[in-house]
């Protein structure tokens, strides 16, 4: 994973010039790192804020780097909401702390029961828990550098904690807003309904396993007893040996579910689909609507 600090530094240089020549307004605007966080924030804040999403649609957070224009958007924001678990987020988190003291950062991974994993997030239903002490935010940033699966927005149980963190930050800033509280509780009710639906969908006595190129469904797999088998190996294209193990596992388990994300190369997926004679199905774990998207993906996994 190539370093991104130099480009952020360049962006900050341009930002410094802009901030010296234009009046700044850091109110009624929120910047978020990825689209799912935009959706979650909107469910609570409604239309009170203009929300800027840094990673554009169709791009991969793994390779994204913020532009100078986006850094200017962040500087004008009242809040910057992120998971703190993706490389560019950590670099940007430090840059904001050093150069944009008026921007309030909301790290939504706080309180979430995290799962161990490297930048490739290669898990086969790995549910190893992590001690998640956020009292030292600097240590927290370094701890996550090579050790935590970041895809916390793909399970409603984790999203409940994400929503709570966002709501609490808004409530501290706007303690008289009853609407944020009501919106938050409505959203939690929807997440509880989704949780119940997924629990019934997967059931306690049914085994559900699937192959996926980039293992973005680790939290969903943990929370609902699924087996996720990743093609990616430590964030890289799988070796011939790794592919052979996956083929053997798929045949032994009679697997028929193969998912891929359009943000990643499809050549390996196509080769595996031909070998196993099963279809390769596109999904988008970064789609904004975390409720409907998680339900749609879950229904694909649960199909006989």
Task: Give the positions of each predicted feature.
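Bacterial N-terminal signal peptides that target proteins for export
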Residues: 1-8
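Bacterial N-terminal signal peptides
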Residues: 8-16
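Extracytoplasmic metal-acquisition and chelation regions
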Residues: 19-304
